Amino acid sequence: MVNYPHQISRKIAQVRTKKSNRVDFANRGMNFESAINATNDYYLSRGLAVIHKKPTPVQIVKVDYPKRSRAKIVEAYFRQASTTDYSGVYKGYYIDFEAKETRQKTSMPMKNFHAHQIKHMSQVINQDGICFVLLHFSTLKETYLLPAKDLIAFYQIDKGTKSMPLDYIKKRGYAIAESAYPQVPYLEIIEKLLGGNT
């Protein structure tokens, strides 16, 4: 069979179809995380807040050097359990928050939150820091800011084995309207909670 440039053989088309059907969960939540990072860059560039993503502490165990200039990490482990995703300062207040995303339409799985994260959030609150979670429902295209005290209260009911209903989040949290700049304008809600005007 002769394949002219404008034709694709069936075999290649089938291989491409098989690859495109594969679901990749490795970067789940990355779009939401990217939007938060862009928002934080926006706040930083305008001198509104200094908030950064915390690096995850990793211990590199084995590195492969196929070429001198192309080192490849082959084996690595988390050094310790991470706390929350983001921290920083806004108007002299310490801010600490976690970001979670789900495709579910009616609840946020509590298995996404770990005991050490809940403990850390509790410690931040005890030091009068501002602590919360940003919860994104990707299917619904809805984002909420839920104060950490409300997350902790729900978590303590059953140590995080259930899912948090969207109704609970709507009653105790704050809807964040999508915008172009910043993409996830959560500081507007923080400002209102502090008693200021936006």
UniProtKB/Swiss-Prot annotation:
GO terms for cellular component: cytoplasm. GO terms for molecular function: endonuclease activity; magnesium ion binding; nucleic acid binding. It catalyses: Endonucleolytic cleavage at a junction such as a reciprocal single-stranded crossover between two homologous DNA duplexes (Holliday junction). Mg(2+) binds at T83, D85, E98, Q117. Its cofactor is Mg(2+). It is found in: Cytoplasm. The record marks K100 as: Transition state stabilizer. Its main location: cytoplasm. Keywords: Cytoplasm, DNA damage, DNA recombination, DNA repair, Endonuclease, Hydrolase, Magnesium, Metal-binding, Nuclease. Its EC number is 3.1.21.10. GO terms for biological process: chromosome segregation; DNA recombination; DNA repair. The keyword rRNA-binding does not apply. It comes from the Bacteria. It holds the Pfam family RecU. InterPro entries: Resolv_RecU (IPR004612), Restrct_endonuc-II-like (IPR011335), tRNA_endonuc-like_dom_sf (IPR011856). The keyword Chloroplast does not apply. Binds 1 Mg(2+) ion per subunit. Endonuclease that resolves Holliday junction intermediates in genetic recombination. Cleaves mobile four-strand junctions by introducing symmetrical nicks in paired strands. Promotes annealing of linear ssDNA with homologous dsDNA. Required for DNA repair, homologous recombination and chromosome segregation. Belongs to the RecU family. This is Holliday junction resolvase RecU. It comes from Streptococcus thermophilus (strain ATCC BAA-250 / LMG 18311).
